[in-house]
């Protein structure tokens, strides 16, 4: 209930203290389910793609959408446009696949599922963010138009055809032009070719990052607006568009066009007529009563047969053999669930180590951290090597 009360407090303050009394439109991160406390989480996109089952993705997002709708979220910011081209990329899990056709079908399903429950979708990121140089996040995509059209445009076209109301521009540049400054990409391609009529949203502070090219934050805001960006995210540049008009960098009509797109969506959402939420009603989505997410996770797994006892598991637990579970993620629930995951309670899931203890005798299991994720510690590594080299001794 606190989220609904907070929503109404924000809405009331804006309506009562702003000059025109225009209601706010709330957005929330939803790359694989709702990134909020007690949010209904889905498996990461890479696993969802491994199901090859768009209907299951659609069903899971329908549940997630119900929760978002009940919490007053108007826009779900959803990862679905990135096609994985380099597995070194740290955000690989946000991609459904390395295949543009499969990625497009999953994007389509995600949009339909979410919007069936009420919230609109901002599909991200456009375009070619999965093509970064050397797998470095937000680095340049060194490709041409053929690769764009064959590999990176299909998911966006599918999301737009499915009814996505928003597109988020990507951080990267393509052939030397930043996506947030690429009018061909944000106007000619998605609006004229794909028929998109919603809003184009910037990624976080991406407009301000154009300063590295323009050297002037006011110019950066004007450039992004002229290139087709309608809504900024955390940046300062769009707050300076009035100065950009005074300096002749943009015309008021260009700002009016962006404002019109935003106001149109607010009217379509009914926010002017019904700006507040009913504060009663359930917003927690129990996984037992809503098993779609768990089913999606199960269908994305590949079960391997342990032929010839290649893996050190045995049916006879009285054999006296031991199991070493090594690695910093083996007993860390949060690290199992991918990026864009909210803080969790310890009893919200089972770690790899927990699962091993459910099957085998706890006395037969030895957990070794092995290393830290963000710093080097030779002692932890030496301990793990020693135990695994002489298993009979522990």
Regions found by a protein language model. Give the residues of each.
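Glycoside hydrolase catalytic-domain context in secreted enzymes
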Residues: 1-394
